[in-house]
């Protein structure tokens, strides 16, 4: 989990 991608691995 990343702050830029949220719970998924895609950047929105």
From Swiss-Prot:
GO terms for biological process: hydrogen peroxide catabolic process. The keyword Secreted applies. Its cofactor is heme b; Ca(2+). The keyword Calcium applies. It is found in: Secreted. One of its GO terms (cellular component) is extracellular region. Binds 1 heme b (iron(II)-protoporphyrin IX) group per subunit. Binds 2 calcium ions per subunit. Transmembrane segments: none annotated. It catalyses: 2 a phenolic donor + H2O2 = 2 a phenolic radical donor + 2 H2O. It comes from the Eukaryota. It is an enzyme of class 1 (oxidoreductase). One of its GO terms (molecular function) is lactoperoxidase activity. Removal of H(2)O(2), oxidation of toxic reductants, biosynthesis and degradation of lignin, suberization, auxin catabolism, response to environmental stresses such as wounding, pathogen attack and oxidative stress. These functions might be dependent on each isozyme/isoform in each plant tissue. Belongs to the peroxidase family. Classical plant (class III) peroxidase subfamily. This is Peroxidase 2. The lineage of its organism: Eukaryota, Viridiplantae, Streptophyta, Embryophyta, Tracheophyta.
């Amino acid at each position: 989990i990343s702050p830029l991608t949220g719970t998924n691995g895609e950047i929105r």
